[in-house]
């Protein structure tokens, strides 16, 4: 992992913890209050698969959305609500605001960031790009608005492979940032000429191939599901590699009854909901007594609590603003991604 201090990681863990866990009665009260506020304010709650289960359930119950970052962006853009509450990390709120500048975008906390975002400062990344002006700049969605504004394309893990293949077919060479593991996976799958930025996700980088192989021995009939932000040695052990939505689909379609899952454990809520007859096991994140920093759950995603959702709704706090000078530049690569994926959907449905 690069360019991120241990202090930031420790502080994120501390901030994510609630000193007094909610009782069932308190939780029900918060959920009812949030639902009422959403309705009164013509607001909608969108949540990422990595948020805690109670937040995901609330989004579904109130007519919102639980999805990966691509569908979160699409849902917020197309929904008629005047206010969008984004339960996720900072770049997701920024993306929602860029795509729908006329809407009010709130987040439970503005402190929920991402190690990939932190590890890709715009000044350093821009200098890297300037050294290779002939290359097309492709950035992962897990980046700041400023980095997106420097890019030619924005991608998510659910569409990155197809977009890079398309660019390669056009004869383009690529600068990729910031996740080195996802970039290396795409490079290996496509053969594309890619220069990789040296960033990583603190959750996925902690999965260990040796311990994963040991776990497979304990569950010989299990299928291994791996997010491509994981190290290459972990990916090589996978039965299915993909984005959050793609891993959920794999859990539904593969015949196995047991799955070892190498991604944030927040995804278990949706997997268990859709596959109640199947067993899901967390892939190991540290071996032989070593301490894990994320322990298979993003500390920043864990900051999205019921208390903070209600507070931002009632008080209008943690509103997302994006520098107006960045918006025209950042929206171009985002719309390229949305247009590309929409065209791919239409093509797929036409071939069905």
Curated annotation (Swiss-Prot):
Q: Name one Pfam family in it.
A: NadA
Task: Name what cofactor the protein needs.
Answer: [4Fe-4S] cluster
Q: Does the keyword 4Fe-4S apply?
A: yes
Enzyme class, first EC level, given as a word: transferase
Cofactor binding mode, per the note?
Binds 1 [4Fe-4S] cluster per subunit.
A Gene Ontology cellular component where this protein is annotated is: cytosol
Catalysed reaction(s)? Answer: iminosuccinate + dihydroxyacetone phosphate = quinolinate + phosphate + 2 H2O + H(+)
GO BP annotations, alphabetical order: 'de novo' NAD biosynthetic process from L-aspartate
Query: What are its E.C. numbers?
Result: 2.5.1.72
Question: Which domain of life does the UniProt lineage start with?
Answer: Bacteria
Q: Where in the cell is it found?
A: Cytoplasm
**Residues the record lists as binding iminosuccinate:** 48, 69, 140-142, 157, 227-229, 244
Q: Specify the protein name.
A: Quinolinate synthase
Q: Which organism is it from?
A: Pseudomonas putida (strain ATCC 700007 / DSM 6899 / JCM 31910 / BCRC 17059 / LMG 24140 / F1)
* Phylogenetic lineage: Bacteria, Pseudomonadati, Pseudomonadota, Gammaproteobacteria, Pseudomonadales
> What's the name of its gene?
nadA
């Amino acid at each position: 992992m690069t360019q991120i201090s241990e202090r930031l990681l420790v502080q994120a863990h501390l901030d994510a913890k609630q000193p007094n866990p909610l009782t069932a009665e308190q939780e029900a009260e918060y959920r009812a209050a949030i639902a009422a506020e959403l309705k009164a304010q013509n607001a909608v709650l969108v949540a990422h698969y990595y948020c805690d289960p109670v937040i995901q359930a609330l989004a579904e119950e109130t007519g919102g959305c639980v999805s990966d970052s691509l569908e979160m962006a699409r849902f917020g853009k197309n929904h008629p609500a005047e206010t969008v509450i984004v339960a996720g990390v900072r770049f997701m709120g920024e993306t929602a605001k860029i795509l729908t500048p006329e809407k009010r975008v709130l987040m439970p906390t503005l402190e929920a960031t991402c190690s990939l975002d932190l590890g890709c400062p715009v000044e350093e990344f821009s200098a890297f790009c300037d050294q290779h002006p002939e290359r097309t700049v492709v950035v992962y969605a897990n980046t700041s608005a400023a980095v997106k504004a420097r890019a030619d394309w924005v991608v998510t893990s659910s569409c990155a492979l197809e977009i890079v293949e398309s660019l390669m077919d056009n004869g383009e060479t690529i600068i990729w940032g910031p996740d080195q593991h996802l970039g290396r996976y795409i490079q290996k799958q496509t053969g594309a000429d890619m220069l990789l930025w040296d960033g990583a996700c603190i959750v996925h980088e902690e999965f260990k191939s040796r311990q994963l192989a040991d776990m497979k021995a304990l569950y010989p009939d299990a299928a291994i599901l791996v997010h491509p932000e994981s190290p290459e040695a972990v990916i090589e052990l996978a039965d299915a590699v993909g984005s959050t939505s793609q891993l959920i689909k794999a859990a539904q379609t593969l015949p196995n009854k047991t799955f070892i899952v190498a991604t944030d454990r927040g995804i278990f809520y949706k997997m268990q909901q859709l596959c109640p007859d199947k067993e899901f096991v967390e892939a190991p994140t540290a071996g032989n007594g070593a301490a894990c920093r994320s322990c298979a759950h993003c500390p920043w995603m864990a900051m999205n609590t019921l208390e903070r959702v209600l507070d931002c709704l009632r008080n209008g706090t943690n509103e997302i603003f994006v520098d107006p000078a960045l918006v025209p530049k950042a929206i171009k690569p985002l719309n390229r991604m949305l247009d590309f994926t929409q065209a791919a959907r239409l093509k797929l449905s036409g071939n069905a």
